[in-house]
UniProtKB/Swiss-Prot annotation:
Protein name, as recorded: Large ribosomal subunit protein bL36
GO MF annotation: an example: structural constituent of ribosome
Disulphide bridges, residue numbers: none
InterPro entries recorded: Ribosomal_bL36, Ribosomal_bL36_sp, Ribosomal_L36_bact
Keywords: Ribonucleoprotein, Ribosomal protein
Source organism: Corynebacterium urealyticum (strain ATCC 43042 / DSM 7109)
PANTHER family according to UniProt: 50S RIBOSOMAL PROTEIN L36 2, LARGE RIBOSOMAL SUBUNIT PROTEIN BL36B
């Protein structure tokens, strides 16, 4: 899990989903899990 300022490039990857949990924005990617990130 990485913490990134901008998730725009990650959400364009194939298989990416943008999820809000507890007021934070996450990108989860089941096809390619190394693209998991939280916006910070």
């Amino acid at each position: 899990m990485k913490v990134r300022k901008s998730l725009r490039s990650l959400k364009n990857k194939p298989g990416a989903q943008v999820v809000r949990r507890h007021g934070k924005v996450y990108v989860i990617n089941k096809k390619d899990p190394r693209f998991k990130a939280r916006q910070g």
